[in-house]
Amino acid sequence: MPSDILVVAALGRPFTLGMLYDARNDKLIPGFTLWEDEVIEESTLESSQPSSAFEIIASDSTDDKSSLMDIEASLKASFLGGLVEVGGSAKYLNNQKKFKNQSRVTLQYKATTSFKQLMTNLGTKHVEYSELFENIQATHVVIGILYGANAFFVFDSNKVDSTNVQEIQGQMEAVIKKIPSVEISGKASVQLTGEETDITNSFSCEFHGDFFLTTNPTTFEDAVKTYQQLPQMMGKDNAVPMTVWLVPMVNFYSEAPQLMADSSTPILRKVRNTLEAIVQVQMRCNDALDDPTVNLFTEVQKKLSDFQKICDDHMSKLQATIAKKLFAIRSGDEDESALLNLFEENLQSPFNIESLNMWMEFEEREINVLRSCMDILTKAKPKVIFNQGVLFKGLYDSKVKHALCYVFTNVTKNDVFLNVLNEFLDSPQSRPKKLRPSPKDYWYSYDDIPETMREKAYLFRNLAKEMNNRCVHFFVTAIHNPKQEGAGIHYYRESIQIIDEFTKPYMPGVESIKDRRELQWYDCELTLDPETAHQVLTLSEGNKKAVSGNTKSPTDHLEKFSHFQQVMCTKGLSGRHYWELEWSGYVGAGVTYKGIGRKTSTSDSSLGKNEKSWLFEYSTKSGYQQIHNSKKTRVTVSSTGFKLLGVYLDWPAGTLSFYMVNKAWVTHLHTFHTKFNEAVYPAFLIGDAQQKVNGQIKLL
């Protein structure tokens, strides 16, 4: 080992002939040589060595990258241990995929130009000794350099579904293989088929090279143009050191430090595997951080960011220790068991790779549970607010009579195992509280809680579908509450929380309802249908208001009432619905099947005078009456001439109820009991030409 000539990759480092090098930590020692510049120049032989080649790989492993750059195992270990700072094209070694679920293909262009070497018979006769010479920690001298240049075009897809990574990678590789033979037209545009263009538009390009470019390529088309120009850019003056030959210093100075030993291949493989496994965990963490669900839950985002930082810190400490051990082994102060012990200690720590991957599995499960719930909830189109200040501002809105809030109650930024990792980083000699995350510390590791959360999400969605109105607002948020497992549907009435496990609105019997808010659960916004309105009715305010008494030219429409001064609403209703209207004059409000007559002057076309319609009517002459199938019954009202009428349709129960509305309270007036067979349309009678009375209504 001490007398062996070393051959190492330059990796963008500024090697020159005669330069000193410490192979124990793979460091250049600039500013010192064994010979004067004139002697080196006179003793240098140069031979032409032109070559060029390209290679394509679809791997991101350190081994494959090192193979492209002709890096041997010992130097690779130094790089992984952080001993070597690379430059130029070798920065490609530091370029790692951000996401695990990402396709990558790399194109390498490699060229050599010349080989320079110092004459082997130079010996020690021209060595310039000095007082500083004895203190220089160099093990080798540079005696040969192969010049040339490397260029790497790194093509990355966007983050994709894990099942598509290989397929997309294959498509990318097939197109990139064509780069060396792609033709460029006179307009310098790349000639590709339509399908190939679609593929290339979906990925990005990053360039690492020993060539000076005014701008680096970022797209496939840029990469093709740059690749075509590289051979013309290659020349003697543009070449950089690529491979370096080193002679031990002891050949010139017997007291020089020596490279006594190096780690065996199995140990170096452990270095690589351990560090690459941590990188894989970090990519997995990046995948999670990029998930849209994580962007919603700041607590989950915080945990993942903390975990990522912890892994970074652990990696840095591990690399620093590996660097020290490599130097000690190469200096002969320790044997390779020192590195072996380091990895054994790592296996017995909470930072063993199995534990790190287990934590990520738990966190990915949490994200999957949250995503599955959000997929259900978003179909209800709720306001998703994870800032509690903004949430309560929304709850205090005067328009919000009722609010249902789906609350994730177990989402928290606190994590027992992250605390263990942090404590071990601070005190690596201490005994860790646990070596791996425990399922009992994670609520989502049990099936029953996520299942209940999804059941509540479906309930919430169905409630939103049933009560999609102005008075009931729906929110989604996260409020940590260990006493409520998984999630709850919290009910707020006029900003006050009433219950935290809501299932359905409390509705008294229709005759006993007194609180207006109970009816507003089923608030329904209606619009009058101008195509049904009798010709003397004038609609305004967005077809919310109708007034009788105006004469206008008759129009013939199949849906229009020709004899009775009536108008219907645009949509048929089933389910539960409540609406309010201001009314005055001679008016009636009710519902009808769509098939009510329109053109006759008989009862078939008159609201309340047939089996198809139900009407609550008011006139100053007759007072209040309920009418169905021509049967009239007077209704006693405590406040004659009230202005605000409420109507509640419970289609499934077969009831249609009318209420006098007074601010926060309602007074029951009458309820029709029947069995509805089809959707009903709110409809109104407004004025009577024969009695020469007018009326008006306004939907609220």
Curated annotation (Swiss-Prot):
GO molecular function: potassium channel regulator activity; toxin activity
Superkingdom in the source lineage: Eukaryota
PTM statement from Swiss-Prot or TrEMBL: Intrachain disulfide bonds may be present in the heterodimer.
Compartments reported by the entry: Secreted
Region (Thioredoxin (THX) domain) location: 385-514
Region of interest (Structural FAT domain), residue spans: 265-384
Sequence similarity: Belongs to the SNTX/VTX toxin family.
Described function: This lethal (towards mammals) heterodimer induces hemolytic activities due to its ability to form pores in the cell membrane. The pore may be composed of 10 SNTX-alpha/beta heterodimers. The toxin elicits potent hypotension which is endothelium-dependent and appears to be mediated by the nitric oxide pathway and activation of potassium channels. In addition, it displays edema-inducing activities, increases vascular permeability. It also shows myotoxic activities and interferes irreversibly with neuromuscular function.
Notes concerning its domains: The first domain (residues 2-265) is structurally homologous to the membrane attack complex-ferforin/cholesterol-dependent cytolysin (MACPF/CDC) pore-forming domain. It makes numerous contacts with the FAT domain and comprise essentially the core pore-forming machinery.
Name of the molecule in the record: Stonustoxin subunit beta
Organism (species): Synanceia horrida (Estuarine stonefish)
